[in-house]
Amino acid sequence: MYSYKKISYQMEEVMSMIFHGMKLVKSLESSLPEKPPESLLTSLDEIVKTFSDANERLKMLLEIKNSETALNKTKPVIVSVANQMLMQMEPGLMQEYWLRYGGSTSSQGTEAMFQTQLMAVDGGGERNLTAAVERSGASGSSTPRQRRRKDEGEEQTVLVAALRTGNTDLPPDDNHTWRKYGQKEILGSRFPRAYYRCTHQKLYNCPAKKQVQRLNDDPFTFRVTYRGSHTCYNSTAPTASSATPSTIPISSVTTGHSVDYGLAVVDMADVMFGSGGVGTNMDFIFPKNDPS
């Protein structure tokens, strides 16, 4: 089965052949009055052969594309042993594969997959975006990494349209406030994966996290994976004693050292001033420490 890169490479070759044929036509046009019949015949043969080769190559690519489209519609998704091993090593690496082709991952602990309609803003207008939402559990034979993710709570993956204006690196606002704490390159992916946690994690011990990554063949669509549920809205407003860590190192006045409040002060400021979304947190005021 041809990959997207192979088809793109073949199309570049076809376009190169077409441009070469056009150059031959222009060359013949400029020297047409002076060419003898023998030379004219040779030039015409070369032009015809060039365009004929490009035509045949293009027909072959269209046949491959049509056959793969028909195969994907009629054939169920089959997981090879190599893909199963890859999913065990990095479960998030194969999520795009399942979301795109609608495969069932019941053997990996998935309980349900369903389609939902999301409204996404695209250049000032609204359009319907069909998103595949995957709710996952965990199997008894999962790896240690999968068991750790089970402890983080319910997992949900959704596809959302990327912003076309403003800071296009940020996913659309989902009515929660987030702090980015990491980013890494993923094997087999063109775009890095960003990691976010709830802004109120330190203050309210909120466990909600999410991962954001662009799709390989559609850079204008984000795959967002949510882990855990927000508990910060169920908590009461913090008091001065609860906002300050119990183990704050306080030195005497003569030492000249100040009190280190750390991230708790930053999170308290987020609550006091209110963050409007993922792009409006207090990172611009307070420096961000290394993620835990």
From Swiss-Prot:
One of its GO terms (molecular function) is DNA-binding transcription factor activity. PROSITE patterns: WRKY. The keyword Coiled coil does not apply. The keyword Electron transport does not apply. InterPro entries: WRKY_dom, WRKY_dom_sf, WRKY_plant. SMART domains: WRKY. Residues 133-155 are annotated as: Disordered. It is found in: Nucleus. Keywords: DNA-binding, Nucleus, Transcription, Transcription regulation. GO terms for cellular component: nucleus. Residues 167-235 bind DNA. Transcription factor. Interacts specifically with the W box (5'-(T)TGAC[CT]-3'), a frequently occurring elicitor-responsive cis-acting element. Belongs to the WRKY group III family. This is WRKY transcription factor 55. It comes from Arabidopsis thaliana (Mouse-ear cress).
